[in-house]
Regions:
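Catalytic-core environment of secreted peptidases
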Residues: 1-20, 26-35, 118-148, 156-158, ...
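Soluble metallo-hydrolase cores and metallopeptidase-like ectodomains found primarily
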Residues: 70-105, 193-274, 282-285, 289-290
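Acidic/histidine-rich catalytic neighborhood of metal-dependent amide-processing enzymes
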Residues: 268-368
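Noncatalytic luminal/extracellular "stalk/propeptide" segments of secretory-pathway proteins
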Residues: 2-145
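Second-shell loop/turn segments in exported
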Residues: 8-21, 75, 86-90, 100-103, ...
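Structural recognition of the beta-strand scaffold that forms the well-ordered cores
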Residues: 2, 40, 118-122, 176-181, ...
């Protein structure tokens, strides 16, 4: 089975961007070339694409400093080309008590000190271990991996634990912008597109790494300072396309067993998030080599376009599928793939330099709505000798990423996913250096074997 180059042509595929739309076009061309029937389905998108961002601080002595910015906060808000300028107020943890304390400084008739301010707040990251995965696993392969995971750093900004600083609170107190200080090394903080699914908040925000944050606070220690924060963005109402591709099985549609939905998403920041598209194309190419008589089920490949945006900005796959019963009526189960072939990188829980760990990333093979599929997935993980893998339980009405949507519709679902520290990172070269091509191939072969076994299951599988 061949696998196309998992490259990052065109840069990050932010939702609705030219690079993203070009990627969807590429996938369509490949799938049509394999003989699949391909359809496109536009859905609404409140598009938000950052254009320019910068931070300049003028200290108490009147000296202007350009402060390096690690990243912008997606859909936080936007400024005009000149940005917004205001006094800098350091709120430390940024909790309600900090806001109240700052507001109290303006009591007695003085103007509220936060009105028109650029607030500075901490953006901590929970220091977790990979045992957060094994704690939710039916089984771990090999069993010795449980002990490894218990010692392995799993501090991940994409988990959103604790939640990102509250922009609405800052705005309600009169702030005009926010500067977040992340507890991450410069190399890891750079380009982190987080939180990746927040609603538009109307308050522009930028994020600094721990070193730039320390330098900023050193400037503030000299006395009152002012900041000019720039975050311009292209914000518009538009559409973006779901992509469906069908590979039919044998016999008339009414006589075939239910279809297998094979899904991923097309938007993402790098060659890992999302490389499910090339993997699904490899599966489509492989199964299209064989006559329809060898397939007892249709394969329906779905590429959703809106993983990296807020629920209110688009129509997510569960709602979209619910609105298309002509599609879901024929689907009996689902297989979802995301973030394959990933290598481990971390900064030792914030205590050291950002570097390769020498390990592969833990793999979650999550299963929902079917004991039959759980048994099948567990057996195939063993048979394929997939390592550092957990057979995961559903969690918080979800199935670890894109698999959540089929799961919420009650469809028996298997979802394969990893979650490296660089998952949401926009980086030079698209983080291709953190992708192991041989491992990517092994993961894709595992999916092909698993999909073949799912196709061979009798109709109306027990749940």
């Amino acid at each position: 089975m061949g696998l196309g180059r998992p490259d990052d042509r065109g840069g990050p595929r932010h939702t609705g961007s030219a690079a993203h739309r070009g990627h969807i076009d590429d996938l369509e061309r490949q799938l049509r070339g394999y003989g699949l029937t391909v359809t496109r389905h536009p859905t609404r998108l409140a598009q938000w694409l950052a254009q320019r961002w910068s931070l300049q601080v003028t200290d108490a002595g009147g000296t202007a400093w350009t402060v390096p910015v690690a990243s912008y906060r997606p859909r936080s808000g936007e400024t005009g080309p000149a940005g917004v300028t205001g006094p800098v107020v350091d709120l430390g943890p940024g909790d309600e008590a900090a806001y109240q304390a700052a507001a109290g400084a303006g009591a007695g008739g003085a103007a509220a000190p936060l009105t028109g301010a650029v607030v500075v707040v901490d953006a901590p990251i929970a220091r977790l271990h990979a045992s957060v995965l094994t704690d939710l696993a039916y089984a771990v392969h090999p069993p010795t991996a449980r002990a490894e995971f218990a010692q392995e750093d799993y501090s991940r900004v994409w988990l959103g634990v604790p939640p990102a600083p509250d922009l609405a609170t800052a705005r309600s107190h009169g702030a005009v912008a926010m500067i977040e200080i992340s507890d991450q090394s410069p190399a890891l903080a750079a380009g982190q597109y987080t939180p990746h699914q927040q609603e538009h908040a109307g308050l522009p925000a930028l994020r600094l790494d721990r070193e730039s944050g320390a330098r900023l606070r050193a400037l503030l220690a000299r006395g009152p300072a002012r900041a000019t924060l720039v975050l311009t963005a292209d914000r518009r109402e538009t559409t973006v396309d779901y992509l469906l591709a069908r590979l039919p099985g044998a016999g008339p549609p009414g006589a075939r067993a239910g279809a297998v939905l094979v899904a991923t998403h097309t938007d993402g920041q790098n060659a890992v998030e999302e490389n499910g598209g090339p993997a699904l194309c490899a599966l489509a190419e492989y199964f299209s080599r064989f006559p329809a008589s060898t397939r007892s089920r249709d394969l329906l490949f779905m590429f959703s376009p809106n993983h990296m945006t807020a629920d209110g900005a688009t129509v997510k796959p569960d709602a979209w599928l619910r609105a298309h019963p002509e599609i879901t009526a024929g689907v009996e189960m689902a297989l979802v793939a995301e973030h394959l072939g990933t290598l481990g990188w971390d900064d030792q829980g914030g205590t050291g330099p950002y570097r390769a760990t020498g390990r592969t990333e833990p793999v979650a093979v999550a299963v929902g709505n079917s004991d039959t599929l759980r048994t099948l997935a567990d057996d195939e993980v063993r048979t394929s000798r997939l390592t550092r893998a957990g057979i995961q339980k559903p969690f918080q009405n979800g199935l670890y990423g894109e698999g959540t949507f089929a799961y919420r519709l009650g469809i028996p679902t298997i979802a394969m996913i990893t979650g490296p520290a660089y998952l949401l990172q926009v980086a030079p070269g698209g983080n291709l250096d953190k992708l192991d091509r041989a491992l990517l191939h092994r993961h894709t072969v595992f999916l092909a074997r698993l999909l073949h076994r799912m196709m061979e299951l009798p109709g109306d599988i027990p749940r």
